[in-house]
Amino acid sequence: AAELVNAGIDVRWCDTHGEQCHFKALLVETAGNGRFLSVLGSANFTRRNLDDFNLETDVTLSLPADHALAISMTTWFDGLWENRNGRHFSVPYADFADERPKLRWTYRLMEATGWSSF
């Protein structure tokens, strides 16, 4: 997550209390061309999962940004991101950030080799 933050991407964590937050959703609205892209499924967004080291099931949707499904998915995501309607789902990156060098280098090794537990 630190790589994303350092690249200027906003990151929030699911605010869990013993349970796991397991869903994966990538939503991209591309500026300028009015397109919406979403990847939903079981794959973690890591080399191990995206380079076919694990059997995963995902679906990719490419829609006009003003399509009803794109609007609905964006509303759903924004509700989780912004804790809307009195429901609490996420917290800022700083709440769970852990940038210890040992963790960073373990992550780098696991990503480079495709050997990981995530």
Region locations from a protein language model:
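PLD/PLD-like phosphodiesterase catalytic module centered on the HKD motif
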Residues: 1-118
